[in-house]
Amino acid sequence: AASPLLAGAVMRAILSGAPYPAMLYESILVRIRADRVVNRARAATIKAYLLQNVTPTHPEYKEVLQVALNEQSDLKPYVLGRLFSLLEQAQESALGLKSATITDRYFDAASATPKLAFPTLLKLNRHHLSKDVDWGWRYERQIGELLTKLNAEEDPYPARLTLEEQGLFILGYYHQKQARYTKKTDSEKEN
């Protein structure tokens, strides 16, 4: 249950245009880490917090604080979130919905310490792609495009992401996942 003090602070921020309380943002991140569910309400809260509290000092964040996927963005935390979503999708396509997915095992590490998680995730992904003869090539191409954005030859993975960058990671993950469902829905309508 939400604290009455937090609810009051959020309402004051909404009505006065003041910054949102950090506790709101931190509680959303804790919930996402606990259940690994990124839904519309949580993504909207992250976006609202970052727009109100962080973009005055980091105007470059505005490019990804949109409603939908920004495929042109080179912002590392956002691209890493997108990459994680594609790795998850490649695993689901190759293996089906298994009991333990990369999201279950690696979401927390990937969103906080990408340098530790992503090399392992990419090794696992090679295994997944080899099992998916139908769609593996497509995922490989999309993943390659994101690795290019990250300058994979140099130092693509930060050792740590700040709390704000973790929010950008989560938004990248959410936007990429929603784009997957949107494209599927659109192609189903055409058939």
Where are these regions (language model features)?
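Intrinsic-disorder/low-complexity detector
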Residues: 1-191
